[in-house]
């Protein structure tokens, strides 16, 4: 096959374009084809997905196909989509094909890597277990993140997934001096713009690469943008031996984009109309996110749960790949308990005495025990009132309410809305605080003293102020 073979457009069906080539000049699967859109005068990239016979291929467009027509000349680049990787990409914002979209000059000091790569082999992968401190109490205590693991943020619309992701980026950049890659997959353009400006303001942009394929873009762009960001993260792991964070907001939109193009590619839909290749598509992305002996990629994925139905195939398929799940609760958000992480539904494989240590494990389980007992008692309280409880149960309810409030925490990225300075709490302080509440050391303090504070010492200070007032 000649490297720059040329073909012609046969058919355009929305984001799917069929292209015919000469005998013996067919491109390979995942090759990038280029066509000049006569309406805009710009180059459009098509990615080959299927060979459909008669020397024709079926491709998915990575930008709008408005203006394309039959007979237009298409050129095969002979290689997959390549994106810029390396130090020169830090602090910049790209689209799915690696073009800068921040209005600055061209990217310098970078290499170009293809977005389709094989996962590291079993022998290259690391098996050591290490905890990544996030500085967010509820996460560090109840759903600790493994370094090089995959973490899912589950929640419906408007419960604070994106704010939590932004706070983690800030904490990793400032407290750990780490690099972060952010893939905006099918989310609001306004949020992407806010994220960029907030990161500029917080001075964390220089340690981050942003890659966007937003809601207004065709499904092809949304389907591939996570791979573009992952490729950039792989460079820092494999070449520079760094520990990198990869944020994907939102992994559900990645599945959604795949299902949009799947039917147009002629595949029979499966359960709830999703693509039959759902597990494969997810596996190709997730298997590349791992720790090697050189470095690690820790991935935090916001997962929209359609209609709050956790059994939907999209979130259910994602579950199988995760090491920790952080479930955001609408009930806690309604009570103003932010971050609205559900302490009973959120789990982590790392919450094991052999990994986090006996003290951490016992405190975490003690907290969950008290909260579960409080949850069991809520029906009795609603019907008969607090007076009907035993003295022991009354004490459990009081401690549970303090724990619930102490699990809340002011975040740096929401300072300008809340006017409360953000707090970063080390794991040791988190464990000490909850241990002392469980021991009954603060049974005499008002529960409001524990709301929106960092360490337990701040809660004691707040209690003194409340008593004076």
From Swiss-Prot:
Binding annotation for ATP: 155-162
Keywords of the record: ATP synthesis, ATP-binding, Cell inner membrane, Cell membrane, CF(1), Hydrogen ion transport, Ion transport, Membrane, Nucleotide-binding, Translocase, Transport
Membrane-protein topology: Peripheral membrane protein
Reactions accelerated catalytically: ATP + H2O + 4 H(+)(in) = ADP + phosphate + 5 H(+)(out)
Keyword Transport: yes
Highest rank taxon of the organism: Bacteria
SUPFAM superfamilies: C-terminal domain of alpha and beta subunits of F1 ATP synthase, N-terminal domain of alpha and beta subunits of F1 ATP synthase, P-loop containing nucleoside triphosphate hydrolases
GO cellular component: plasma membrane; proton-transporting ATP synthase complex
InterPro entries registered for this protein in UniProt: AAA+_ATPase (IPR003593), ATP-synt_VA_C (IPR055190), ATP_synth_F1_bsu (IPR005722), ATPase_a/bsu_AS (IPR020003), ATPase_alpha/beta_chains (IPR050053), ATPase_F1/V1/A1_a/bsu_N (IPR004100), ATPase_F1/V1/A1_a/bsu_N_sf (IPR036121), ATPase_F1/V1/A1_a/bsu_nucl-bd (IPR000194)
GO MF entry, a single one: ATP binding
Localization per record: Cell inner membrane
Presence of keyword Cell membrane: yes
Family, as annotated: Belongs to the ATPase alpha/beta chains family.
NCBIfam families: atpD
Function summary: Produces ATP from ADP in the presence of a proton gradient across the membrane. The catalytic sites are hosted primarily by the beta subunits.
Subunit structure: F-type ATPases have 2 components, CF(1) - the catalytic core - and CF(0) - the membrane proton channel. CF(1) has five subunits: alpha(3), beta(3), gamma(1), delta(1), epsilon(1). CF(0) has three main subunits: a(1), b(2) and c(9-12). The alpha and beta chains form an alternating ring which encloses part of the gamma chain. CF(1) is attached to CF(0) by a central stalk formed by the gamma and epsilon chains, while a peripheral stalk is formed by the delta and b chains.
Protein name (record): ATP synthase subunit beta
Native source species: Thermosipho melanesiensis (strain DSM 12029 / CIP 104789 / BI429)
Lineage, highest ranks first: Bacteria, Thermotogati, Thermotogota, Thermotogae, Thermotogales
Gene: atpD
